[in-house]
């Protein structure tokens, strides 16, 4: 089986958005080797069995060179798809910036899928293993009303500064 490396070591949302890329490559016969932030590795491995994940330090400034090195040390020279736009050391950051940093005509997820040569409609082919026992435990812990809204205000640049208002229970 041919190996291929995928460079997108983090943020969690980017990893989830790119999982269908790895699935597509796996279905095409590749053994996908994907360095990701060490603090995400166990969680992602519990849910995804079609990728070989490698831990790299969750330091945005060093992680891309470390990811390349981790692949090379383990497998030597194999093809690598770098889709880690905006991470220092990524080979695609310059093109990404020229195209509008994900806010131009081509959105950030479209950019990643194009570079990986994966049809964009594969984005919706997210496949993972579920743990219903843990899901129900979390549901029971947080959901206190029949109607609820789940919001995420934290992002890579900090925290969104606005008040969320709803007639429903708000789960942050």
Q: What do these predicted ranges mean?
A:
Residues 1-172:
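Catalytic machinery of carbohydrate-active enzymes
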């Amino acid at each position: 089986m041919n190996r291929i490396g995928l460079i997108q070591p983090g943020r969690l949302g980017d990893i989830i958005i790119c999982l269908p890329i790895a699935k597509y490559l796996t279905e095409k016969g590749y053994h996908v080797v994907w360095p990701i932030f060490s603090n995400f590795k166990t969680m992602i491995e519990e849910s995804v069995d079609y990728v070989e994940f490698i831990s790299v330090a969750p330091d945005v400034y060093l992680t891309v060179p470390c990811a390349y090195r981790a692949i090379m040390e383990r497998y030597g020279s194999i093809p690598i798809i770098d889709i880690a736009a905006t991470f220092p050391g990524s080979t695609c950051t310059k093109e990404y910036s020229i195209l509008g940093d994900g806010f131009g005509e081509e959105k950030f997820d479209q950019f990643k899928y194009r570079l990986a040569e994966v049809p964009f409609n594969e984005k919706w082919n997210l496949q993972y293993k579920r743990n219903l026992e843990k899901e129900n435990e979390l549901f029971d812990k947080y959901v206190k009303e029949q109607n609820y809204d789940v919001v995420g205000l934290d992002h890579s640049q900090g925290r969104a500064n606005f008040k969320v208002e709803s007639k429903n229970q708000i789960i942050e």
